């Protein structure tokens, strides 16, 4: 296989700047992995992901993921895998956010079935940037490390390069960084 060169952008020195329960790999990788209710340690990062961690809540947790993704323009795929979180339904909510966005008046993620699917701490431009920047790879309820590694590898091969926009850095509110700072990638 021939290595192809794709354009990459510098990543802010403090990336990922929103605290959470995640492992960081090569910031130039095009893949971010959300493992939902499953803890896969550093397996996705060892397979080539830039960042990986669980996602337990469909509101602040998703805001943290979005904030860290849009701060790294090299991320072009969001692989959503692992066991769905009962009640919060974070996998379905992330898919709804990516497909449908957010109701501009209520902040509710359109089409989400989770208990509290509201985005309250992010501007619309951040959500739209997230939706443009990454392709969502749906592996909800898949926990097989070999299948996840294979999919990460496929994403790396199909890397189209960084989005032609600068990093979008949102400084988190007190809610995002103080409430359960080590949870919700």
Curated annotation (Swiss-Prot):
InterPro entries: MeTrfase_MtrA/MtxA (IPR030688), MtrA (IPR005778). Its cofactor is 5-hydroxybenzimidazolylcob(I)amide. One of its GO terms (biological process) is one-carbon metabolic process. Binds 1 5-hydroxybenzimidazolylcobamide group. It is found in: Cell membrane. One of its GO terms (molecular function) is tetrahydromethanopterin S-methyltransferase activity. The chain crosses the membrane at residues 22-38. HAMAP family: MtrA. Belongs to the MtrA family. This is Tetrahydromethanopterin S-methyltransferase subunit A 2. The lineage of its organism: Archaea, Methanobacteriati, Methanobacteriota, Methanomada group, Methanobacteria.
């Amino acid at each position: 296989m021939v290595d192809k060169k794709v354009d990459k952008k510098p990543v802010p020195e403090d990336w990922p700047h929103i605290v959470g329960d995640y492992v960081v790999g090569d910031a130039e990788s095009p893949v971010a992995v959300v493992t939902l209710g499953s803890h896969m340690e550093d397996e996705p990062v060892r397979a080539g992901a830039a960042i990986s961690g669980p996602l337990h809540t469909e509101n602040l947790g998703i805001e943290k993921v979005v904030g860290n993704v849009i701060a790294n323009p090299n991320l072009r795929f969001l692989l959503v895998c692992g066991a769905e979180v009962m009640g919060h339904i974070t996998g379905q909510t992330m898919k709804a956010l990516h497909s449908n966005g957010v109701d501009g008046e209520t902040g509710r993620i359109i089409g989400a079935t989770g208990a509290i699917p509201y985005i309250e701490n992010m501007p619309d431009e951040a959500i739209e940037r997230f939706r443009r920047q990454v392709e969502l790879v749906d592996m909800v309820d898949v926990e097989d490390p070999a299948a996840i590694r294979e999919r990460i590898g496929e994403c790396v091969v199909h890397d189209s390069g960084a989005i032609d926009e600068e990093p979008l850095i949102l400084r988190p509110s007190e809610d995002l960084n103080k409430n359960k700072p080590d949870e919700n990638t």
